[in-house]
From Swiss-Prot:
Enzyme class: oxidoreductase
Protein known as: 3-oxoacyl-[acyl-carrier-protein] reductase
Its job: Involved in biosynthesis of fatty acids in mitochondria.
Catalytic activity: a (3R)-hydroxyacyl-[ACP] + NADP(+) = a 3-oxoacyl-[ACP] + NADPH + H(+)
Pathway where this protein functions: Lipid metabolism; fatty acid biosynthesis
EC number in record: 1.1.1.100
Organism of provenance: Saccharomyces cerevisiae (strain ATCC 204508 / S288c)
Family annotation (PROSITE patterns): ADH_SHORT
Length: 278
């Protein structure tokens, strides 16, 4: 039996998430892409040229889940999805769980299993806290914190079950890994007006991941946080209030600005490092 690792990447239809999917696929992983709408997942995170250049065993699909609707998205009977192929048009699918694609891809010779989760979906704040509505605050917290925590717990349960079910996974690839994409704004030293709720959501995610790492280390699951500064071409850059963007640029300087591909490289470095430590 060949065991083939799969990555789940949220917020993967554009920006940092898209770059991460491209990097992981390039490195030989299969990917389950999560986007917020059916329309967004139709814009696959990996272009057809790269898909065709992938290895024969690699698979890719996309699933639509609106994280703003936490916790109700947990109760859906099925999720709209699309599976992508090297040699034929995409096929619309219905998936009963996030791990359904792995079961559909597996056969008597190959077992696909989720070994990596990257929580990259994020929602920015566009005004001062006093001008941010209760509904907007709820959306920010649901997307940036509540849903990532839930995704993390769902995947950790799956990872622990996989380790018990297939003991031979040990040594096959990198250790099961969670990577949560936070922000430089999570730091108490960064006080940028117009980002208060967003910063709080990212601080919560960072602290959650720090403590979770200690909880999961005895269970052979690694948990990491990446806290980028300004990332070119992302929604955070485009949606930040002008004053907040200018202040952030002055505060972090040129060294704090990066490209999505750099974040993707850091994700791969963390994941592949766990293979060396196994």
């Amino acid at each position: 039996m060949h065991y083939l690792p799969v990555a789940i990447v949220t917020g993967a239809t554009r920006g940092i998430g898209k770059a991460i999917c491209q990097k992981l696929f390039q490195k030989g992983l299969s990917c389950i892409i999560l986007g917020s709408t059916k329309e967004s997942i139709e814009r696959t995170a990996i272009d057809r040229g790269q898909l065709q250049s992938g290895l024969s065993y690699q698979r890719q699909c996309a699933i639509a889940i609106d994280f703003k609707k936490w916790p109700h998205w947990l109760d859906y009977e099925s999720y709209d999805g699309i599976e992508y192929f090297k040699d034929r048009p995409p096929l619309k699918q219905k998936y009963s769980t996030l791990f359904d694609p792995c079961n559909k891809w597996s056969n008597n010779e190959r077992r696909y299993y989720v070994n990596l989760l990257i929580n990259c979906a994020g929602l920015t704040q566009e005004s001062l806290s006093v001008r941010t509505t209760a509904s907007q605050i709820q959306d920010i917290m649901n997307v940036n914190f509540m849903s990532p925590v839930t995704m993390t717990n769902i995947c950790i349960k799956y990872m622990m079950k996989s380790q018990r079910r297939w003991p031979e996974l040990s040594g096959q690839s990198a250790r099961p890994t969670i990577v949560n994409i936070s922000s430089i704004l999570h730091s108490g030293k960064m006080k940028v007006p117009g980002t208060s709720v967003y910063s709080a959501s990212k601080a919560a995610l960072s602290r959650f991941t720090e403590v979770l790492a200690a909880e999961m280390e005895p269970r052979n699951i690694r948990c990491f946080t990446i806290s980028p500064g300004l990332v070119k071409g992302t929604d955070m850059i485009q949606n930040l209030p002008v004053e907040a963007k200018e202040m952030l640029e002055r505060t972090i300087g040129a060294s704090g600005t990066s490209a999505p591909a750099e974040i993707a490289e850091e994700v791969w470095s963390l994941y592949s490092r766990t293979a060396l430590e196994t």
